[in-house]
From Swiss-Prot:
Keyword terms, alphabetized: FAD, Flavoprotein, NADP, Oxidoreductase, Plasmid
Species classification: Bacteria, Pseudomonadati, Pseudomonadota, Alphaproteobacteria, Hyphomicrobiales
Annotated residues for binding of FAD: 7-13
Family classification: Belongs to the lysine N(6)-hydroxylase/L-ornithine N(5)-oxygenase family.
Taxonomic superkingdom: Bacteria
Entry protein name: Rhizobactin siderophore biosynthesis protein RhbE
Gene3D superfamilies: FAD/NAD(P)-binding domain
Keyword set includes NADP: yes
Pathway: Siderophore biosynthesis; rhizobactin biosynthesis
EC number: 1.-.-.-
Organism listed in the record: Rhizobium meliloti (strain 1021) (Ensifer meliloti)
Length: 454
């Protein structure tokens, strides 16, 4: 069994970024394990014309170490694309390119091992280490001993109860849209449910596939959401400061119960639609409605889906909806459904065996994750369990944001080193999130803070 300083479980952008930063520190042995055979990032939503919703500097390393060999700019240099990107004049890079960049980076990191699914993690009391057991696609098993682990398993597509029915007609989560788009184009009536960016991108793609001739023959798209409208995501410069280390630190000072209440009211900071996507959809509808024509897309807000059933043997659905304000009900028929209903954390089963005995839990049964991204130990042990992309009620709306990944990883690496190698305490925002009387510079993390982690 091989011993490591850190074992990363899951290789998404955040753990990949951690592996990238650790590649600069040869004294810290590490291994990262991923079930998939290779890195892929939201492959079902890498549609033509789609971009990241954050600037390219939200890559794996730049916000912690701009000179790192695995930065996006160095990726461009290696692939002879610097001048092309220079003339591209757009901070928002294509999703296809971001995925290719991450795959390129993963291929430079020998610590990343794909095709190994972590099936169990147990705590070894004698050494205060974690025994990580993985299984390959062929069934072979491997064990690793690590003093610390970093959980980066990410989220899984969420389908509400009404969508969990068996049917022959297409009923899919938006994460499947890319690979099933052709199938949808053959259906006469398609309904998209949800009003976030993923829903809007699915609607735009379907609308681009829908010709005026198809509309004249009866084809149509319905876009339904329970939200009050199809609203844009907050993207003002001061609004973006909620995605900084400053706000993350401030948010973590708030009482846990209050945090959950606050996050519930901050949806449009990260759940809305980009202005450009809204504009493209509206402009297409405007153009296609010239002369009183039907543009082929109907939008319905404040309509909550309550029931879904197959419409006999016709290969279609009946959707039961309720209008939130009118409290009136209606039934609509459709031949296919795209449920853009978001994602939920899918914590691995083995984590349950560590809760209580090794890791503290809160009154809701969740891990207690500190401002340093460590899950609090219940047994007094010194080995750390770092949590990547914890729920937003731990660290605020920026927890899943790519732009904060490098900062979080810098904090983690500093703890593994036992010193502040990466500067993580500098103020990053103009606004102050606390009281005026507390407008002081961020306190420095002392050497003692790092010493206990080394």
């Amino acid at each position: 069994m091989t011993d490591f300083d850190l074992a990363g479980i899951g290789i998404g952008p955040f753990n990949l970024g951690l592996a990238a930063l650790l590649s600069s520190h040869e004294n810290l042995s590490n291994v990262f394990l991923e079930r998939k055979p290779a890195f892929r990032w939201h492959e079902g939503l890498i549609l033509p014309g789609t971009t990241l919703q954050v600037p390219f500097m939200a890559d794996l390393v730049t916000m912690a170490d701009p000179t790192h060999r695995l930065s996006f700019l160095n990726y461009l240099a290696v692939h002879d694309r610097l001048y092309k990107f220079y003339f591209y004049e757009n901070f928002m890079i294509p999703r296809q390119e971001y995925d290719h960049y991450c795959r390129w980076a993963s291929q430079q990191l020998s610590a990343c091992r794909f095709g190994e699914e972590v099936v169990d993690v147990a705590h070894e009391s004698a050494s205060d280490s974690f025994i990580v057991e993985s299984r390959s696609a062929s069934g072979g098993k491997q064990q690793y001993r690590s003093r610390n682990i970093a959980i980066g398993v990410g989220t899984a597509p969420f389908l509400p109860k009404w969508a969990q029915i068996k049917t022959l007609a297409p009923l899919m989560h938006s994460s499947e849209f890319g690979r099933r788009r052709l199938e949808l184009s053959k259906r006469r009536r398609v309904t998209v449910i949800g009003s976030g960016q993923s829903a809007a991108e699915c609607v735009l793609a379907l609308l681009n596939d829908l010709t005026p001739e198809m509309v004249a023959a009866g084809a149509s798209i319905q876009w339904i959401t329970r939200s009050a409208g199809f609203f844009p995501m907050e993207y003002s410069k001061l609004g973006l400061e909620y995605f900084t280390p400053d706000y993350m630190r401030h948010f973590h000072r708030i009482a846990p119960v209050r945090r959950r209440e606050i996050v519930a009211d901050q949806g449009l900071l990260y759940k809305g639609i980009s202005f450009s996507t809204i504009g493209e959809i509206f402009d297409l509808m405007y153009e296609r409605s010239v002369g009183g024509r039907d543009p082929g897309l109907a939008l319905f807000s404040n309509c909550a889906v309550e029931t879904l059933e197959s419409a006999g043997g016709s290969g279609s659905f009946r959707i039961g909806i309720n209008h939130n304000h009118l409290d009136e009900k209606a039934t609509v028929e459709t031949d296919a459904i795209v449920a853009a209903t978001g994602y939920r954390h899918a914590w691995p089963e083995w984590l349950g065996s560590l809760k209580g005995s090794v890791l503290d839990t809160c009154e809701w049964g969740d891990l207690v994750v500190g401002g340093d991204f460590r899950a609090r130990r219940s047994d007094g042990g010194k080995g750390h369990v770092f949590v990547q992309n914890a729920e937003t009620f731990h660290h605020g709306v920026g927890a899943p944001d790519l732009g904060l990944g490098a900062f979080r990883n810098a904090v983690i690496v500093n703890q593994l080193l036992g010193r502040e190698h990466y500067r993580v305490n500098a103020s990053a925002s103009f606004q102050k999130f606390g009281l005026p009387s507390s407008q002081t510079a961020p306190s420095s993390i002392s050497g003692d803070f790092y010493a206990h982690a080394s």
